[in-house]
Structure formats: C-alpha cells, structure tokens
Amino acid sequence: MSTEGKEQFHISSFVVRCLPERLQDIMATVASMPGAEVHGDDARGKFVALLELESDAALVETITAIELIQGVVNTSMVYHHAE
C-alpha cells in the first residue's frame, strides 16, 4: 500500500546518551529543533527525546542531526508510531 500523496504523522521517542558535561547544552539544542521535546534527564548523560514530525524523511533527518551533535554518544529508539 503506497502512502505517496497522503499526509503522514510520525511520533517517535528515544533515549539520547551523551557526555555528562554536555548534557544541558545538548538538551537545549534538541529542544530547539522543530517537532522536538526533551524529558527526563539524569546526571549520567541520558535524556528522553520525543519527536512529532510529518514524514519519515523528516524523522530520519532529525535523528541524524541529533546523532551529529558534538558530545552525543548514541541514540536508541524506544517507540515509533505512524499514521
């Protein structure tokens, strides 16, 4: 079934692991991205990111942008829903 030409909506959450000394800066950077929210951080350098975007391409672009932030160690997707 093709979704071409149809509106899509993607909700995704994941854990971002980063260097603890960069945690606050990275959280602020992620929070400033379109469709992104940040939640639940800890002092060891982990926080939850929530993305609500209109295409799978935008989702991949945003996750890639987060992974390329200096000090990010990795991202682990926890949930993804698309309509």
PLM region spans:
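Amphipathic, hydrophobic secondary-structure cores in small proteins
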Residues: 13-17, 23-82
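Short, flexible, solvent-exposed loop/turn segments with mixed acidic/basic and small polar residues
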Residues: 1-8, 36-41
